[in-house]
Each structure stands twice: as structure tokens, then as C-alpha cells.
Regions:
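Short, intrinsically disordered, charge-balanced linker/junction segments flanking boundaries
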Residues: 1-5, 211-217
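Alpha-helical scaffold segments in carbohydrate-active enzymes
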Residues: 14-19, 65, 143-150
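Acidic/polar loop patches that form or flank catalytic/metal-binding clefts of enzymes
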Residues: 72-79, 132-133, 155-164, 217
Length: 217
């Protein structure tokens, strides 16, 4: 988003229709990483920059994989990652931006890296391709998780790949009787395990089954 400074005032201009956006304010340490044609700008608080390189590689590989699969996102090739406090969400995606809570910078965890892959996918499914209504939320959530799932599929083989696919199936069926994909956003807390298993895992499974039926192309 272009920024102009006049008389000490910052003016942010968005040439495309969209929500106003979000701001993160703090005494950040800025570090920029390059992955192919993508520029990742990390803004972290002092003491939290030890995982920047690892997270940057995870995010950069995700961007490259999704670009090969889906083309470039409308949000451009610059991606800003900002650290926020622990009183908000663990992750929050905006056009060309990702907000990450401070607790995620304490140590590198596999679940955090998996989540980063999914959050990057929202630059395509939710930001580039919008939703017609709130009832379509499962499409964005499911496609983002499926995109991350397909990326992780390329990193394992043999028995590990079988276990990986079986885990997705088990998660998608765990709360089978709780709510449908369409009703989950209105009936369940989006931070609950049930919501995440249904919207993420079952949503991803729908697209995996579609791929298995029609083929990758």
C-alpha cells in the first residue's frame, strides 16, 4: 500500500476496494528477507528475532509453492509480518500482511510452521479470491488448509505420507456429528478445536477428494 508523508502525517492509499486495514505500532526491529521474487519484511520486538530466519524460510517456500500452483496473488510480492501482543489472536491475516502473537516467537514449533503455511495461503483464498457471503467461509478456510496440506505432501514419502493423509481424515471426522461445514461458522467458536477440525481439516479433505476424483490438473 503506497504511503506518503506530509507535515508529519502519514497517508495510506489503497487503489483497490477493500477494508480499511490494520496497523501494528511498536519499537520494532525490522529485517527483510528475499525468497525468489518475494520480499518478506519482519517487524519483531527485541529478543524475538531469533526465529525470523526459520519462519522466513517457511513463509518463503510457501509463497513459491503456491505461486507455482495458483499464480501470483493480487496482494503483490511484498509481505509484512508484524509481532503483536498475546491479548489478541495468535494469527491474523490482512492483504499483504500477517500479524503474529508474541508467544509464537518464544520457540520454533511444528504446529506454528504448519499454521504459517496456511496463513500465507489466505493471500490467495480470501484476499485474491473473495467470498460472496459468510456462508462461504469454509471455502476460504478449506482451500487455505488444503494448499498447506498439498505443500506438506511434497515433503514426505512412503509410510510418513500415508500417516499424514490418515491424520487429515481422522481430524475431519472427529466432530462429524457436531456441525456441518456451512453451519460451523455460526454455531461454533472459531478458536475451538471443533471449529478448526471441521473448517480446516474437513474443508481440506473435500478438496483432496475432489483432486483424487478429477486429478491434479
Amino acid at each position: 500500500m503506497p504511503v506518503t508523508v506530509t507535515g508529519g502525517k502519514h497517508r495510506f492509499v489503497n487503489s483497490r476496494p477493500g477494508l480499511i486495514g490494520n496497523l501494528a505500532y511498536g519499537k520494532f526491529i525490522s529485517r527483510t528477507l528475499k525468497f525468489g521474487e518475494y520480499e518478506l519484511q519482519f517487524n519483531t520486538l527485541p529478543g524475538s528475532d531469533t526465529v525470523v530466519q526459520i519462519y522466513g524460510e517457511t513463509i518463503g517456500k510457501a509463497f513459491e509453492h503456491y505461486t507455482r500452483s495458483f499464480g501470483k496473488p493480487d496482494t503483490g510480492t511484498r509481505y509484512v509480518i508484524a509481532q503483536i501482543d498475546d491479548e489478541s489472536l495468535d494469527f491474523y491475516t490482512a492483504p499483504g500482511m500477517l500479524f503474529i502473537s508474541s508467544r509464537q516467537f518464544d520457540q520454533v514449533r511444528g504446529i506454528t510452521e504448519d499454521r504459517l503455511q496456511r496463513e500465507v495461503a489466505f493471500q490467495w483464498w480470501g484476499q485474491t479470491v473473495g467470498l460472496k457471503s459468510f456462508d462461504d467461509a469454509w471455502l476460504s478456510q478449506g482451500l487455505a488448509e488444503y494448499s498447506a496440506f498439498s505443500l506438506r505432501e511434497t515433503e514426505v514419502t512412503g509410510a510418513k505420507l500415508d500417516d499424514f493423509r490418515r491424520e487429515l481424515l481422522e481430524k475431519s471426522l472427529t466432530f462429524e456429528q457436531t456441525a456441518s461445514l456451512l453451519r460451523t461458522p455460526g454455531n461454533l467458536d472459531d478458536q475451538s478445536t471443533a471449529y478448526q477440525y471441521i473448517m480446516y481439516s474437513k474443508g481440506a479433505l473435500v478438496f483432496k477428494l475432489l483432486r483424487d476424483t478429477l486429478g491434479k490438473d
